[in-house]
């Protein structure tokens, strides 16, 4: 076999392998750019994050998960918010505090306490979500619950800009809503 043919085949194999890896990774992970202030201080406008698109195909959402979803109002851009209430939960917001099933949530990540009140029960197959910038976020307190089938995935990490790299999967973010 001529050297040029071996070299060409090796390059072709490398390109095919790179494309296969790209499509495999792309089917599992999404790259999302944050475009607004609704998740400040956790996320800043201009942050780039990686999203696990298989997270809720293989498991269930948890309190405190930061998720990407298609908005219920049908707008073009996807939303990013934090899961506050799960199916069957009673959510109440009063006096600047959030309560799930009567238990106050510990929320060290919010920009400021909410200046609004809310009360409702999360229906089966839905989530109650809020932005961390409670008073500058369009979220479940305004337009209701997010159907689970609208969820694209779970935010994993901020990867850009480099000085703001951080893990978004933090198990202690929200105290359990079923008790202390």
Residue ranges and their predicted role:
Residues 38-42, 57-60, 82, 88, ...:
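Short, surface-exposed secondary-structure edge patches
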Residues 135-144:
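Active-site loop architecture of trypsin-fold serine endopeptidases
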Residues 1-78, 148-150, 154-180:
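Protein maturation boundaries and topogenic segments
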Residues 78-103:
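Mid-length scaffold segments of soluble, non-membrane domains
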Residues 119-124, 144, 149-150, 179-180:
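Solvent-exposed soluble domains appended to multi-pass membrane proteins
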Residues 100-115:
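PP2C/PPM family metal-dependent serine/threonine protein phosphatase catalytic domain
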Residues 131:
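Phosphate/adenylate-binding glycine loop and adjacent helical scaffold
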